[in-house]
């Protein structure tokens, strides 16, 4: 009897996980976070600034529209599991700037100034 209950519970949990699955778009991904919003950019990065100055370690990007966004460079305020992801985002933005790839949309945390990038969607 216990095996049957466990199987039913396990199947219900597994079905629940499969139903939600991985996000299929930046909009779905962004909706999983609090204090975020989507910005439709559809443009190339106009300027890329990287600062390694103490507590203000970050990358700042701007667009022709004047919109400004940041990615913090990993520092003591981040846990180890966040550091690699932040470094990848910083590297992605640098490559995007250098190759003049268009950024389609950004998901940003709007509780920081400038708004901090949580996810990015690009197009060629």
Swiss-Prot record:
Keywords from the UniProt entry: Disulfide bond, Enterotoxin, Signal, Toxin, Virulence
Region forming the signal peptide: 1-21
Cystine residue pairs: 30-107
Domain of life: Bacteria
Molecular-function annotations in GO: toxin activity
One GO cellular component term: extracellular region
One Pfam family from the record: Enterotoxin_b
Stated role: The biological activity of the toxin is produced by the A chain, which activates intracellular adenyl cyclase.
Subunit text: Heterohexamer of one A chain and of five B chains.
Protein's name according to its UniProt entry: Heat-labile enterotoxin B chain
